[in-house]
């Protein structure tokens, strides 16, 4: 299924959870923190400004992004995969290689 979020919303696939610490300790699923990184899989058309103009989003499909621990509280299931839906303003940064 193909998604097209509305306005300034972004759909993100969360990165895989870290199940091992830097010291090599394996964490059980309940102790592992949900990652706050992901890949943008769909973007809306942009934010509608007060004057009616549409400001395009600064992120694009394929961008690796960092977001807050409480961002993306809206999850949807698409083709068996959990995806996050959040506003562009909930994204802190784009990870550049």
UniProtKB/Swiss-Prot annotation:
The transmembrane residues are: none
* Keyword tags: Chaperone, Cytoplasm
Q: Entry's Pfam families?
A: Cpn10
Name the major location: cytoplasm
Xref: PROSITE patterns:
CHAPERONINS_CPN10
Q: Which SUPFAM superfamilies match?
A: GroES-like
Q: Which CDD domains match?
A: cpn10 (cd00320)
Extract one GO cellular component term from the record. cytoplasm
Tell me, what is an example of a GO biological process annotation in this record? chaperone cofactor-dependent protein refolding
The record's subcellular locations are: Cytoplasm
GO MF: ATP binding; metal ion binding; protein folding chaperone; protein-folding chaperone binding; unfolded protein binding
Domain of life per record:
Bacteria
Coiled coil residues, start to end: none
Q: Which InterPro entries does the entry link to?
A: Chaperonin_GroES, Chaperonin_GroES_sf, Chaprnonin_Cpn10_CS, GroES-like_sf
Subunit and partners: Heptamer of 7 subunits arranged in a ring. Interacts with the chaperonin GroEL.
**Which family does this protein fall into?**
Belongs to the GroES chaperonin family.
**Biological role:** Together with the chaperonin GroEL, plays an essential role in assisting protein folding. The GroEL-GroES system forms a nano-cage that allows encapsulation of the non-native substrate proteins and provides a physical environment optimized to promote and accelerate protein folding. GroES binds to the apical surface of the GroEL ring, thereby capping the opening of the GroEL channel.
Q: Which PANTHER family match?
A: 10 KDA HEAT SHOCK PROTEIN, CO-CHAPERONIN GROES
Name of this protein: Co-chaperonin GroES
């Amino acid at each position: 299924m193909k998604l097209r979020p509305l306005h300034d919303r972004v759909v993100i696939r969360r990165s895989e959870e870290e199940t091992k610490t830097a010291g090599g300790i394996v964490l059980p699923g309940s102790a592992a923190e949900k990652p706050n990184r992901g890949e943008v899989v769909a973007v809306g058309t942009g934010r509608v400004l007060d004057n009616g103009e549409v400001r395009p989003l600064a992120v694009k499909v394929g961008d690796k992004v960092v977001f807050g621990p409480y961002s993306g509280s809206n999850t949807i299931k698409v083709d068996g995969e959990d995806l996050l839906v959040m506003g562009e303003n909930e994204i802190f940064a784009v990870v550049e290689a």
